[in-house]
């Protein structure tokens, strides 16, 4: 059993992008920015508990940070982890209506 405190730390934010929006509309899949140490089981449990929906699958990937320049200095953005969460048919998560 995963502790409730850990579940609240797993999902950092929804990832809003053109690809994510199309995925949500066509394949009932939501995209989240998650903690780098989060496992698929933790992500599934967190989504089910926080949004009260049934999850059918979780796919994760590590996004590498881009190299960016500010004047003459060269910096690098942080790496982060992204999760594609598939929901059962008919389930939906409404981020706009969330408070």
From Swiss-Prot:
A biological process from GO: translation
InterPro entries in the cross-refs: Nucleotide-bd_a/b_plait_sf, Ribosomal_uL23-like, Ribosomal_uL23/eL15/eS24_sf
Record's keyword terms, sorted: Ribonucleoprotein, Ribosomal protein, RNA-binding, rRNA-binding
GO MF, one example: rRNA binding
Any one cellular-component term (Gene Ontology): ribosome
A Pfam family matched in the record: Ribosomal_L23
Subunit description: Part of the 50S ribosomal subunit. Contacts protein L29, and trigger factor when it is bound to the ribosome.
Family, similarity comment: Belongs to the universal ribosomal protein uL23 family.
Functional description taken from the UniProt entry: One of the early assembly proteins it binds 23S rRNA. One of the proteins that surrounds the polypeptide exit tunnel on the outside of the ribosome. Forms the main docking site for trigger factor binding to the ribosome.
HAMAP family assigned to the protein according to its UniProt record, in alphabetical order: Ribosomal_uL23_B
Designated name of the protein: Large ribosomal subunit protein uL23
Lineage: Bacteria, Pseudomonadati, Pseudomonadota, Gammaproteobacteria, Alteromonadales
């Amino acid at each position: 059993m995963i502790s409730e405190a850990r579940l609240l730390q797993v999902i950092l934010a929804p990832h809003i992008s053109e690809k994510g929006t199309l995925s949500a509309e066509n394949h009932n899949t939501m995209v989240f920015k998650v903690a780098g140490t989060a496992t698929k089981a933790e992500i599934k449990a967190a989504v089910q508990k926080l949004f009260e929906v049934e999850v059918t699958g979780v796919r994760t990937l590590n996004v590498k940070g881009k190299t960016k320049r500010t004047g003459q200095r060269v910096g690098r953005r942080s790496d982060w982890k992204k999760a594609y969460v598939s929901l059962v048919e008919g389930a939906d998560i409404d981020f706009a209506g969330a408070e």
